[in-house]
Every structure is written in C-alpha cells, then in structure tokens.
Amino acid sequence: MNNTMKPMHKVPIDALKQVPYLDIANLQGRAIPTLSFYDSTKWHFWMPTSDGLSAIDARPAEGDYFSRAPERPSDIYMEFLNFMVQRAYWPSVARFIDAIRNDVHNLGASLQKFHLFHHAAKEKRFHTRRFASTEIEYIFGTCRSMFDLLQEVIAALWDTVRLYDQNIPKRHLPKSFRKMVLKDGKVMASDDICDAYGIPKQLADYYSRAASFFAVLRQYRDNIIHHGKTPEMIFLTERGFAVSKETEPFASFSVWQQDQIQPNGLASIRPVLAHVVIETIKSCEDFAHTIQGIIRFPPDIAPGFRLYLRGYHNEELILLESVKANSQWWDA
C-alpha cells in the first residue's frame, strides 16, 4: 500500500484510542502523521473511515511508518522528519513537513534515473545527455525549494510555540529562507541575523551555518529559471555523465578525488549531486538539533517508536555518502 502524501482526515479522539501506540493524552492539537506501525514482527495498519478507524491487513509498499527498528535494511531514518512528526506535527506545519517528506522520496527517484539514462546510452537507445541535464536542474531546484519549505515550518512554529527563554520577544519571521540569510545578495553574519529578526543566537548561528550552501544553490537555480542561463555542458562518457573539473559551481564543492578525474579533465557529476542532496538534508537535520534547545515541544506522539521512510528508490539515498567519498561514476 502506498501511503505517501495522503490527505489529512479528521478522526474522533475516541477512535484513535484503539491505536495502542499513540499517546492520545498528549496530542495537544497535533495531527497523526501515519497510522502504519511495525511492532517487532507484525504490521498494524489503520484506515480512516466515516465511522472512525478500521484495522486492515496491509503494509506500506512506499510510504512512512512507525517502528522501533527498520523492517527492511533499505528503510531510512531521518532525525529531522522523525522529530517533526513526533513532536511538532501541528496542522499549521503538517503540509510543509509532508512536502519535504515527498521531496526526499522524489530525490531518490531522480538520482536513480541516471542509471536508466546511463544504460540507455550504452545500448544506444536514446540520446540521453539532455535527459541528464534537465534532471540536474530538477535536483538543484528541489533542494532549493526544500529550504523554503523548511522556512515555512520554522515561521509557523515560531508563531505558535513557547520558548525556553520567555524573555525573548518574538517577531513574525519571513517565509523565505533567502530573506533570513541574504541581504543585498550577500550572506548575513549570525549577529546581523539575530538583530534583524530578534531570534536567539543559537537559531541565528544555524542560519549562518546553512547560508553559504543555500546561496550557491539559489544562484544556480536562479541563473537558469530567472536569468535564462543554459545549464553547464554535460558530457556523456563510457562511465556516465561528466562535467569539466573547472565547471562552477561544481568545482567549488571539492568532491572529486584526483584518481577519479579522467585524463581529459572530465569528472563525474554523480558525487556533485550526492553532495547537494547530502548538504540539503544536513541543513534539515541541523535545524532539528538546534530548535530542540530553543522551543518547548510536547512529548512524542508515538513513544518508543521512530519514523522510517520506505521507498522504491531508497538505495540511492543510502549510497549518498559512499558516492561522494569515492567520487563514484555510474559504472562503479
């Protein structure tokens, strides 16, 4: 069963009491992110109905579920998503969190497409260079949009929750990540962010850490979407898709090992894409670490459980660190 990006249903509290894994007494207005549970050896799945909830015999083919451990080695745990759905899944932020969850699945699918493109090119079935070029645009664009989704989450949380330090006056935060970290196109220092928006130093430091990578991501996307710049030349080699080792912004990421660069100066685009996805996810994880020391959150919705992501394309996400560390090509 596919349970990704399902619409939010209203279910009576009394009906939710039949799900033994939920801490109904401490919901505090939060929504339930999934009714899929894996408890050691057995799946438990509830479906909203007009009468409340109905237990059914099902398991997720693609989607997210609660468990004490992954049911499959390929099921992914992300601290950011687990924290948000367990402790901050209010209706005002749920759709943004769900959009980030969906983007993670989409990035896995997008990365896996390159294997299809590579095999199709080797078999001379299609001209795949432009396939790769447009997919690179998609990955950069999706990662860029995830920062704005994250900022929507931050702004909504900021308006609705209590700070540990209640002497700090709260202001409304912009819903654009760019406005939080850039001024006149330049990265703002942590102290300037703190002064501009009246946020705690810990949160301003988080924005400062994320700003430089975000600025590169934004500039690449804006050059293509808003300024009419064509994507960098993508080369098709026997080992997969490549760019010149001098190509920016890719060269500035410093992800290529010298022994993986071809004699003609071409380097695999694969570790570049891995780097972009890794840094985007790290920024989300960093936020989860930071915000827990600033905002008072209710306890876990499903105590003792974690959220795991199941997808058809998780393997690409699991391999990200290895691909980046080893400057891997598609024939590796």
Model region roles, listed by residue range:
Residues 101-130, 148, 152:
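A short mid-domain helix/strand-loop element embedded in enzyme catalytic domains
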Residues 143-145:
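Loop-centered beta-sheet repeat module
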Residues 2-102, 126-137, 151-332:
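Acidic, Ser/Thr/Gly/Pro-rich intrinsically disordered interaction regions
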